[in-house]
Amino acid sequence: MNKPDLTVSDYLKWVNESHYVEGLFEKDTMYQDHVYFRGQASVSWELLPSLFRDSERIHDENMMLEMANNMLWTELNDCRSDLEKMIRLQHYGLHTRLLDITYNPLVALFFACQTPSKPDDDKDGVVYCGYKEGANTKTSYTIAEYVFNHNVFDINQTAFENICKKNNVTQEDCGTIHLITPPLNNPRISAQNGAFIMSPLIKKDVDSHFYIATQADIKKELKTAFMKRYIIPENSKSSIIEELDYLGFNKATIFVDITQKLQYINEKEDKKTMWKIDLNG
């Protein structure tokens, strides 16, 4: 006997339970603002920023950002910092050390219900839920800007220590992940109630004097940053997508580009046509 499809209501029950498990959450506390979610179309995908999914790509970050900045300088001209540029480039599709998250569990559910890009990927989706204890997003954003703007591959230990001291940043700050709530001047981030987890710098040959993470450190820390997960079976995805559409979560509202909005219109019209064929059949 087949299990009944999961519903949005089932999922929201899990979300509510995840807020108050293991004594981490108290009802009506400010800490709920720091609960975040990430939806992935395949449960088999690693929980890693795109830059770190290929070990050979990690040390090309500066070159990739410089090339993108040169090619797209008009599109990036209104960004107030290099970190804002990286955030925008992330949404354009550049591989970065940023991991997209959202404060809206229904947005995460929408992404978890998409179809994986590769045919061999596991078709079940997943939503991860995490919590940043005592997160000060303003401070984290400031630290993240500092970490982004200083490439420790190009400086020695003394210079690195001096830069940290001058900017009131510790070396430990440079070796941990940071929760970033960016300025909502990007319509797509605003539409998705989006934020990011920024992974730290990686030093290829780790010097004991530098507190810079290894790739293994980042994988481990990201796993601990998401304490719960909810599997979305493949056979429930289409019905959940329909429920989300009824609730106002669809391609036209979550994405701001015209292509996605027009694709949504086409898909709605295709469904109407199929429905008419079924009635007449």
Placement of each model-derived feature along the sequence:
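Catalytic-core elements of nucleic-acid end-processing and repair enzymes
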Residues: 1-281
